[in-house]
Amino acid sequence: YPTAKIFFFTRWNCKNFKGSDSEKVVDAMIEVCGNYSIPIFDCARKGSIYADNDTFRRIYFQKSKNNTDTAHLNSKGHDRFLKVAESFLLQY
């Protein structure tokens, strides 16, 4: 697919994100994608998905033991993020 485009999306934020290894990974992804001119969306800071919030996770994330899943959106979560992701993708 020589004309296909590639995009990256970072992980969501998490509890104690600021200064964490998770933040370092997000920043590294942004830096590497920038070096190769690959569009990347910073979901941790701009995604409007609040994985660090217990109430938010109960509503927008898949059910998990002790409500600890911070990665997998449910259908409501996907509906919420769709507008944000679509807006990013349509820039390209």
Regions found by a protein language model. Name each.
Residues 13-92:
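Catalytic His-Asp segment of secreted/periplasmic serine-dependent ester chemistry enzymes
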